Structures are given as C-alpha cells and as structure tokens.
Amino acid sequence: MSYNKQLCYNDLTQNHEGAKAWRMSPEWELYTTVVTTMGVEDKFYESGQDRVKRIASLVRKVDAEFVAQLAIYAREEMQLRSVPLLLLVELAKCHRGDSLVSRAVSRTVQRADEITELLMCYQWRSSKKDLSGLSNQLRKGLAEAFCHFDEYQFAKYDRRNRKVTLRDALLLVHPKPKDAAQAELFRKILNGTLDTPYTWETELSAAGKQKFSSADERDEALCETWQQLIRSGRLGYMAMMRNLVNMTNLCIDDESKEMVCRRLSDPEAVRKSRQLPFRFLSAYLELTYDRIPNPWFLRASRNYWEDNAGKALSDRYYEIERQMTIIRNGYHHRHASKVCRYPVRTALAYNANYRGTPIGIFPKRHIRRRIKQRLHKEGLSRKDMLKLQKLEKQLENIRKRQSALRTYISKRPMRYDGAYWQRNEIGFQKLVKSRRAEWARRDKRLASRKLTKTEFVTPLLEALEEAVRSTADNIRGFDKNTRVLLASDTSGSMFRPVSQQSAVIYYHIGLLLSMLMKFRCENVVTGMFGDFWETYDFPSDDILYNTLEMISHEGEVGYSTNGHAVIDWLIDERRVMDKVMIFTDCELWDSTNGGSHLSRSWSIYKRIAPDAKLYLFDLAGYGTSPVSMKRKDVFNIAGWSDKVFDILYALENGENAIDMIRRIVV
C-alpha cells in the first residue's frame, strides 16, 4: 500500500465547475485569495461576503506572524489597500500577548484615510454599533500611524461624510505628538480647521462653481485649470493618468501635453507611483474610445444587464446547480453523463455507453434491469438520471445566453462601432446625446488647431506604452534560448470586473500580463483558450497595443475552460517548451465531457519535454489548483501586480511566494 498515494488522494477535491482539483495548504490558499481581492465585491463563483468569511477562517488556521507578513506584502508589493486591513482586523481578533499586531498596523497603514478605513472594517467585522471595544494592539498601531502624516495628507482625506472620521479616530486612539507642531496639527483635526489642500479635485470644483454663459466658455475655464495644475507640478501621477480623457476632450495646449507625456513615461515616476499594470491598460482603453460608450457608460450598461436579464439567468443557473448537486450526491458526474446517453428505445447494448454493460444485442427489458440495478446500487433512480440530463441541457442553454450577455457588457473598445443598438435597449439616449455634444465641442477645438483626435492622442498612447514597458524591467531569468508558451483564459468567469469602479476585467489582466512576458521573451508562443486553443502572433515592441489586439479577438475560441487543450496542442505538435504559463482563474474543466484534464495532459507532455515547467498565474484566488502543487514541475503564482514576476525569478532560485513573504520583517 502506498501512503503517498493516499495522501495525494486526500488532497483531491472539486472546483466550482465540478471538475477534479487539488486543495491548497491554508497558507497558499490565504495568499492566493488575498492578493486577488480588491474589496468586498462579488466574484463570478463566490460572493464578497463568502470570500471575507473564507479569509477570516484561514487567518485562524495559519500562524499569526505569517498573517502579519502577508498584510505587509499585500500592501507594499501588491499595492492593495482594503484586504490588508481586513487581515489585520481578523488577526487582532484571534492574536494577543505581544506587539505583532501594532507593528503590522503601523507599517501597513500608508495613507491617512486607511486609519478610518481600518476602524470601519473593525466595526463591521465585530458587528458593534461603536468602537468602544477596539483591540489595544490596533489602538497602539493606529496611534503610531497618526504620527506618519502631515497636514496636507490629513486634509486631503478628511471626509466628514464617513461613519468614522479622522476626528473620531484621534479621540479613540489618543496618539502622542512628537513635538509642538504635531500637537497643533492634532488640535486642528479636533477643531476641523485643517487648511484646504491644493488638489486637482478642489481646483476643478472651484472652477466648476463659477457661472458660464455657454458650454464652450465652461470648457475653456476647465482647460485653463487643468493646464495650471499640470504646470504646477503638483498633479499626482495617478490623478494625471485617470484624467487623460478629460484633458483630451478639453484639448490642453501642446506644452501641457508634452509635460504630461514626459511625466507618464518617466521610469522613476512610474516606480514611485507604484501603479498596478492594469491601471495603464485602463487609461489606454479610455483614450482609444472614439464616439463610443465611455467606461462610465459601459459600467452602467453592465449594471443594467446584471440587475435585470443577467440576474434572472444567474438565479436560474444556481437553482439548477443546486438540483443537480442533490441528484449527483454520491455519484460521479462523468458516470452520470454516460448513463444519460443511454437511449431507451434501442436494443443495442453498446449504445448504452455505460460501463459494465456487455457488448451485443439484448432485449430492452434486460438492459433496463441491469442499468436499474446498477443505479439502485449507486443510490439513484432512472428518473433521477433523466432529470439530470434535462437539467444539464437547461444549464448549457443558460451558459450560452450568459456568454452572449457578457459579449454585450464586456469592455471591447474596438468593437463598439455601428448603430449601438444596446443604447436604446438600456435607455441612455440623453447620456449619449450629452456625450455627442461634448465630442462635437472637442472636434471643433481640434479642428481650430488643425488636428485630428488620433494626432492629438497618439503621443499620450506612446507615453503609456513607455510607462508600462518600464514595469517589465523587473522580469528576469529569460534569455533568447528560453522557450515560453503564454496562454490566456477566455472563459465566461474571466469577464468579471476586478472591482465595481473598474472598466478592466480578469480577461484583460491575463492578456496584459502575458504581453508583459512576451515583451521580455524572444522565443515565445502566445494564444488564448476557451472551447479550443488558438495561437496569435504580434510584434513584441508594444505591450498595450498588443493587449488591445488580443482583446479584439475575444470570442473566437469560445468561452469554455478547456485548459488541457493548450497542452494537448503541444503534444500533437510535439513542441518542446521550457516554460508553459497559463493566466487563468484556475476553474478549469472539460466542456466536452471527454475525460480530459490539465493534470493528465501535463503528465503525458512530460514524456516529450521532461524539463518543462508549468506556471499557473491565479487571477481570482478561489482556493484550488487544477494540478497538484506537490509536483516539483508545477508552480502557482497569484496577483495582478508586475511584482508577480519577482516570484517567477525566486522560483528559479528554489524559493516560492510563501518563502518570499516569510522573509518580511514585521
């Protein structure tokens, strides 16, 4: 008896699609979940509340120091803000006796508004009406954090309309000022007399409150305000990138535009800004829209469909899944599907497609009796199996309708041309009319300068390309002889936005990370998989443009999750690769019910390429892996930041993500 085989069997489970998967250790599951969470938002397979509960449960299964290290890693390396605070709150609820929590809080809180965010998170997770029972370690950590910020930072994030304000936090944690100047600053917070900060929001708000005789006059005033902000040098990198469309629509002058381009493409400014790569893609997508729905319109469209047609489909989908789970209880899906294919009206036993049925021609009654006996042994009736078959057909129909629905609500900038029938369906005629008026004014201003929108926007697009290229500089360990395959998942679950405010979806992130890798590799094959695998070839120079081109091919390979098709293609072509990288949410299954699986295909491929390594880039963090992580040739990497490539380099040196996190000194 092989005990190793028994241990491997104990790791087996099923993913959300019902396919074979492997459990992760609590540390790995917590890591993959945390670095793929931006807030309490619903994922495709998991609600936001369920994910928070899962994180809270995992915090209690791992050692406290690792949780503190992971919170710091998520904040400093992955550039996440909300989920590190959740980790610290859950850690404070179950760990006491030392200063670990306070030290982690002091280091994790890096923006003034995170002080109040952490307190609101604690109040939410404690289900209390007030903060009177706040953990002493959280108090000490927040008291230290108060001393890290100046008046500008406090004034910028002093929001009086929040449930917990900076004044409330100050009265609660009682920080000790370092000197008289800081004591005066704390008094200003208490009295509400902080100086109004010089920010782009306050300047534009002041300009917008003036009275104008026409829309053109208003645009001129706002344009002048933007130009002053740019020349002042006090416009932040993120604010500049978020408002490129506004600057374009207002047609800022050439001098200001050149300053914006220089700032965006400056490698040092990119490094200090600590922007996630998909932020550059989001700005690039917005600039490439031309007389088409802008991201706000697309978000409104998506909400409409999800709240109406999409919600009805989802409710029916989950109800069918619930019924199928009840029927399948104790019976494997693959066997159930085989029984469903048995035709009642025929006497050919081999058509039954049922294991154990003898080959040959037998009376129908005899065949039915044998199958009925087998089903009874498994705890199912023939009626149950027929019902299961009917439900599966309904489920497949809903999946097709959901795929079509996602086509309408996904952010495909190159395909929103033509009549825009969905505008009338959604009822945003007034919005479209106002946008058209804004675009008409923009075109008029450009015409006066003898420019087209393409000529005006091209330098900004090039600046964004330069910026994102600098984020690829930390990708190490690849030379011209390294053979790499990059595969991106296009399944329906990848069309979920990373957050409610974002126009970027998981599908975009997978493509962008693959294009970043392509930029650094010379011997590379890129492609997408859904129902099948298809390769696409683009020049390696442009990252964002190539991502846009890949987005335009969405739907050509279908919306299934047949990740095994990537490896099967390598087997059929007998292509030897050094590294195979799959960017996915790890919810893979065989939509053809043919018994294929990524793990099985990889084992076969290893006979052709014994030295090949498989890298799974987990973009959603559902807690399972389609291949056993105990294999020495399979690696799991999670997250959306370019810092994931540091983990890739660490793997070459015998380390992994958990080892990197454990090296952090709290």
Can you say where each PLM-predicted feature lies in the sequence?
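Short basic/aromatic active-site micro-motif
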Residues: 507
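Long lumenal/extracellular ectodomains of secretory and single-pass membrane proteins
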Residues: 1-504, 519-666
